[in-house]
Amino acid sequence: MAKKFDKDSFSGTLIVVLAVSLICSVIVAGAVVGLKPIQEKQKLQDKQGYILSVAGLMDKDTDIGKTFAERIEQRVVDLATGEYVKDAPKDFSARIAGKDPAQSIRIKPEDDLAGIKSRAKYTEVYLVKGEDGKIGQIILPMHGNGLWSVMYGFVAIQPDGNTINGITYYEQGETPGLGGEIGNPLWQQKFVGKKLFDGQGKLALHVGKGAGSDKEHGVDALSGASLTSKGVQGSFAYWFGENGYIPYLNKLKSAGAQ
């Protein structure tokens, strides 16, 4: 006669615990798989929202998907040449490509002003169309190390390739109330209208203590967050240097955004 299962015995309790754990694991795994498409859709919408925001096209009533489709054209740029990549996949992500040795480059330490060690060979750029269909501004991704985190943001510039229309940071882990203020629209507003380059084409934008007195190129550093501010400066120095967007911006100036 088969021995009756005793759930109150040590072995019985262990079997029950393992069975419950297995069932819970299956449920959690199923939930993760089931929710992933929803999470990915939300991440995409959040990113599009930040792009629209830095372009000045976002308010509480904005239909993000519709406005993005109508006003934003995503292109992929070869950073080495500044040319558009014609056969790039629609879902190309420089952030993902940057983790693939075949799609990225190692940055020489002396050139790594942003402290990122490597970057993708290609990156997305976003052309913002006006009501007349003409390109009115270009949104460029930018990232670099702060005090505690990699700071990911967007910079909106005019078609002259020099004048800043806006900046935003959409992901960062700097100290709340200090370095975390890079996400404060009041500080971001200080960049609007600033020129990236001087008359000789050299990067002139600078972020530092008292830099705001330079009305054309300077932005005051965040109070109590010198290392985060230095990271912002380093990000601009790298991405708007010869190893970043300079080849692309030079082509914009000579041929136009189209």
UniProtKB/Swiss-Prot annotation:
Its EC number is 7.2.1.1. GO terms for biological process: sodium ion transport. Its cofactor is FMN. The modification FMN phosphoryl serine is found at S226. GO terms for cellular component: plasma membrane. HAMAP family: NqrC. Belongs to the NqrC family. NQR complex catalyzes the reduction of ubiquinone-1 to ubiquinol by two successive reactions, coupled with the transport of Na(+) ions from the cytoplasm to the periplasm. NqrA to NqrE are probably involved in the second step, the conversion of ubisemiquinone to ubiquinol. Composed of six subunits; NqrA, NqrB, NqrC, NqrD, NqrE and NqrF. This is Na(+)-translocating NADH-quinone reductase subunit C. It comes from Neisseria meningitidis serogroup A / serotype 4A (strain DSM 15465 / Z2491).
